[in-house]
């Protein structure tokens, strides 16, 4: 077999093998993206459930004589793209309960006999165009400590809304209305197309004790 015929055979072989190899690679990348989307959705659900649970329990009172009118504090115009933040307090519950880090709420983890949880966005150190969702709570010495719940966050919006409106209209008032709307936007970058995709989750949460 001459050199030319060898080169021709190799070229034809490469031409025949390349399409199925490329197809296999594309399928594997797509499968990886689907797995990453599922994992991201699970992480978003987990973060939103921790936030929703804290909102539902905020304002709990052991005694009717205690005051809870400031146990839910929503702040707007945060440092990252004007994002919102929410601070949540309650009396120490008699039943088993956990904070946003998975710690059991106890007397040591209180200030003035109230538990404390704070959710807000903090700009990412490695990516200035995104933020991390931060959860603050109290340690056993009653001091603040924090943990990251979610990365690549684009916004966190929290508002009191009108629970009697069909579309849960956002209200400008800061006072309790019985229903809070929380929306969280997270960026996901496709590894195949390199295109950014925004994944949003919205929840309406009713505080039980306010």
Give the residues covered by each predicted segment.
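Surface-exposed loop/linker segments characteristic of extracytoplasmic
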Residues: 71-159, 198
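Aliphatic-rich helix starts adjacent to a transmembrane/signal segment
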Residues: 1-60
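Short, glycine/small-hydrophobic-rich surface segments
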Residues: 33, 55-83
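Short linear sequence signals and composition-biased patches located at protein termini or domain-edge surfaces
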Residues: 39, 77-79, 92, 141-210
């Amino acid at each position: 077999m001459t050199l030319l015929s060898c080169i021709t055979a190799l070229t034809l072989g490469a031409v025949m093998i390349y399409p199925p190899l490329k197809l296999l690679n594309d399928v594997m990348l797509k499968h990886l993206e689907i797995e990453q989307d599922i994992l991201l959705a699970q992480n978003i659900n987990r973060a939103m459930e921790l936030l929703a649970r804290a909102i539902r329990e905020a304002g709990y009172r052991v005694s009717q004589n205690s005051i809870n009118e400031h146990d839910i504090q929503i702040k707007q115009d945060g440092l990252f793209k004007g994002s919102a933040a929410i601070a949540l307090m309650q009396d120490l519950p008699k039943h088993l309960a956990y904070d946003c880090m998975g710690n059991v709420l106890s007397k040591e983890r209180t200030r003035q006999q109230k538990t404390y949880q704070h959710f807000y966005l903090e700009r990412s150190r490695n990516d200035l165009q995104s933020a991390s969702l931060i959860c603050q709570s109290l340690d056993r010495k009653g001091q603040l400590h924090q943990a990251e719940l979610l990365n690549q966050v684009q916004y966190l919006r929290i508002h009191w809304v009108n629970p009697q409106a069909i579309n849960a209209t956002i209200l400008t008032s800061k006072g309790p209305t019985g229903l809070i709307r929380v929306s969280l936007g997270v960026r996901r970058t496709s590894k195949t197309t390199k295109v950014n995709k925004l994944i949003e989750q919205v929840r309406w949460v009713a505080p039980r004790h306010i």
